[in-house]
């Protein structure tokens, strides 16, 4: 005898899969990004991916020649991943961490680069994650996670873990739509450079927290 509840669940899963596949075919990366925003609004900072101008501005201070490990929190559909990979040396590694399994699945299929690792997990566990891939320290960590809307305690935990995982001289690169995000960095980073990027939707604050 067919279980009505199980059948309903199977129908729901199948429908969700068809919607996801349809979005991917019709809208490509942007459709996946919108779907991720709708599914996890507190974990995705904006419904619109970052602009090329913002990406260049954010990555400008990075010393690519001396970068062996670059970590990104909340990569979404890879808006930053591709420019980072273009700039990285051939022996460097990019680890992208996201709690949204749809984004991770998309990135694993879409980015074919041996230097790229997509991990389904929490940014607060960054130390364990990079150790699992043979690293002790990161040179740079990039984040567009919306610190001000994350669940209580998550933002401070991520900032603390990031400071611990960075090598001396490394930096935490943060782009946010609210200036309050600086407060999360100030607890751990003595030197914080900042800027504002107008050419983005919406315009946003940029912070670079440097580890002594």
Provide a role label for each language-model segment:
Residues 26-28, 32-65:
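Class I SAM-dependent methyltransferase Rossmann-like catalytic core
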Residues 67-76:
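Conserved class I S-adenosyl-L-methionine
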Residues 77-90:
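Conserved SAM-binding loop of SAM-dependent methyltransferases across substrates and taxa
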Residues 93-98:
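Conserved SAM-binding motif I beta-strand of class I
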Residues 104-132:
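S-adenosyl-L-methionine
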Residues 156-168:
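A short glycine-rich, Lys/Arg-flanked "PGG" loop and its adjoining helix->strand segment in the class I
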Residues 169-176:
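Conserved beta-strand signature within the Rossmann-like core of class I S-adenosyl-L-methionine
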Residues 197-212:
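Core SAM-dependent methyltransferase catalytic element
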């Amino acid at each position: 005898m067919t279980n009505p509840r199980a059948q309903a669940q199977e129908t729901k899963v199948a429908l969700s899969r068809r919607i996801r596949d349809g979005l991917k075919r019709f809208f490509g990366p942007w459709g996946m990004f919108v779907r991720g925003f709708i599914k996890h609004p507190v974990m995705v900072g904006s419904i619109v991916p970052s602009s090329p101008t913002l990406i260049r501005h954010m990555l400008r201070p990075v010393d690519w020649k001396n970068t062996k490990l670059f970590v990104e929190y909340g990569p979404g559909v890879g808006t930053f991943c591709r420019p980072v990979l273009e700039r990285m040396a051939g022996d460097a590694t990019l680890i992208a961490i996201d709690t949204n399994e749809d984004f991770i699945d998309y990135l694993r299929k879409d980015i074919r680069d041996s230097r790229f690792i997509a991990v389904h997990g929490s940014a607060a566990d960054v130390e364990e994650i990079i150790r699992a891939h043979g690293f002790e320290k990161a040179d740079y960590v990039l984040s567009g996670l919306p610190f001000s809307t994350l669940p209580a305690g998550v933002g401070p935990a991520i900032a603390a873990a990031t400071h611990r995982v960075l090598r001396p001289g490394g930096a935490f690169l943060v782009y946010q739509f609210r200036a309050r995000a600086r407060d999360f960095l100030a607890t751990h980073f003595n030197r914080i450079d900042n800027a504002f990027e107008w050419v983005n939707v919406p315009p946003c604050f940029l912070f670079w927290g440097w580890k002594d």
